[in-house]
Amino acid sequence: MNEPVIVRLTVNGAAREGRCPPRKLLVDFLREDLSLTGTHVGCEHGICGACTILFNGEAARSCLMLAVQADGAELTTVEGLMTDGALHPLQEAFREHHGLQCGFCTPGMLLTALDLLRVNPEPTEDDIREGISAVLCRCTGYHGIIKAVQAAAPRLR
């Protein structure tokens, strides 16, 4: 039961493969086996949102999933947002509107906001507040983050 298993998945558009114990968390697999350290480990209980990734296009907590559950899946981590060295429009908006301070929540916040904008391309401020409430930020007070999501919305339509 503890024999390593092969996990094959697509991460940030590239086919990836790794061997890991069957009970290894997806967040640890991403960080330790695939060297994608942008996904942060916060509470390890699915509460803080720092470990949020896109799993088959939808926001998901990677600390609540086993790596084997991602076999055959398509994942996007914060490292996958840039294209040819250029920041994603949402990342640009976060920079322009001071949507980060310490940066610990930023990867999870970006991917949560990206999923929100996929589902609701024209969110109200209340929609944004509700959508990002799944990610805890202890530094910004959320004002810059909300402004950044508002600014990014028309760029992504």
Question: Predicted segment positions?
Answer:
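Signature of N-terminal electron-transfer/Fe-S-associated modules in redox systems
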Residues: 1-157
